[in-house]
Amino acid sequence: WIMGHMVNAIAQIDEFVNLGANSIETDVSFDDSANPEYTYHGVPCDCGRTCTKWEYFNEFLKGLRKATTPGDSKYHEKLVLVVFDLKTSSLYDNQASDAGKKLAKSLLQNYWNNGNNGGRAYIVLSIPNLAHYKLTTGFKETLTSEGHPELMDKVGYDFSGNDEIGDVAKTYKKAGVTGHVWQSDGITNCLLRGLDRVRKAVANRDSSNGYINKVHYWTVDKRATTRDALDAGVDGIMTNYPDVIADVLNESAYKAKFRIASYDDNPWETFKN
């Protein structure tokens, strides 16, 4: 999965997919009442990027729905996965469940079109704080109570705080989450970060009793770092330059071993050689 980083304006969906992304990451900010409000990152952000592009969240969802609904004039067949980077640090811990409920309602209405031929992309809810795990339960409860538990088949999870792998495992246990787990690791492109924790995450993914299904590394803009991440065995790379990742995947060393994921590749299934 080549994951376009910080895609917060509808116009950027086309831009990143046309550069080679089959997945995008979108920032979601919340208001004081835990309503998802804007797709917005703000300052500071990655080096070389404009930090202030934004849409109202529900409007972004409608644009995203068009981009992922077969037959729509804006449809991109290869856009198959969307990571919502949920900026919950503005909320109190006890608002996490409400944030999940309100997020589910927004997605149900504006993205899934109330279950009637909505967008088809898989969705990862990426949460920065382990203490906010009840966002996942609030989300699930709402889809169930609104009569669409089947949409949970399209939903996965990530805790993005670079926490100890063991602590993340415990948190999923508390949340009652088994499966559909992505594990992110990374840092802004302005700084360097080693691959030690990525290797631990990959080892967990490949063990018989691990909780992780997929591992992705962010934010990678350089060819050398891309190669290092691929050598470590990641499933996804988040980037500001999808074309750079696509170029490296075309190199003879990687062409035989990796390919770009399509809609038929289940993002919740651990890949077995």
UniProtKB/Swiss-Prot annotation:
Keywords: Cytolysis, Dermonecrotic toxin, Disulfide bond, Glycoprotein, Hemolysis, Lipid degradation, Lipid metabolism, Lyase, Magnesium, Metal-binding, Secreted, Toxin
Ligand binding (Mg(2+)): 25, 27, 85
Free-text tissue specificity from the UniProt record: Expressed by the venom gland.
UniProt xrefs under InterPro entries: PLC-like_Pdiesterase_TIM-brl
Entry's family note: Belongs to the arthropod phospholipase D family. Class II subfamily.
Domain of life: Eukaryota
Cellular localisation: Secreted
Enzyme category, top tier: lyase
Chief localisation class: secreted
Function noted in UniProt: Dermonecrotic toxins cleave the phosphodiester linkage between the phosphate and headgroup of certain phospholipids (sphingolipid and lysolipid substrates), forming an alcohol (often choline) and a cyclic phosphate. This toxin acts on sphingomyelin (SM). It may also act on ceramide phosphoethanolamine (CPE), lysophosphatidylcholine (LPC) and lysophosphatidylethanolamine (LPE), but not on lysophosphatidylserine (LPS), and lysophosphatidylglycerol (LPG). It acts by transphosphatidylation, releasing exclusively cyclic phosphate products as second products.
Residues modified by glycosylation: 250
Endoplasmic reticulum listed as a keyword: no
UniProt-recorded name of the protein: Dermonecrotic toxin LdSicTox-alphaIB1av
Molecular function in Gene Ontology: lyase activity; metal ion binding; phosphoric diester hydrolase activity; toxin activity
One GO BP annotation of this record: killing of cells of another organism
Catalytic reaction list: an N-(acyl)-sphingosylphosphocholine = an N-(acyl)-sphingosyl-1,3-cyclic phosphate + choline; an N-(acyl)-sphingosylphosphoethanolamine = an N-(acyl)-sphingosyl-1,3-cyclic phosphate + ethanolamine; a 1-acyl-sn-glycero-3-phosphocholine = a 1-acyl-sn-glycero-2,3-cyclic phosphate + choline; a 1-acyl-sn-glycero-3-phosphoethanolamine = a 1-acyl-sn-glycero-2,3-cyclic phosphate + ethanolamine
EC number: 4.6.1.-
Cofactors that this protein relies on: Mg(2+)
GO CC annotations, alphabetized: extracellular region
Catalytic center residues: 5, 41 (nucleophile)
Cofactor binding comment, as recorded: Binds 1 Mg(2+) ion per subunit.
UniProt-listed Pfam families: GDPD_2 (PF13653)
Cystines in this chain: 45-51, 47-190
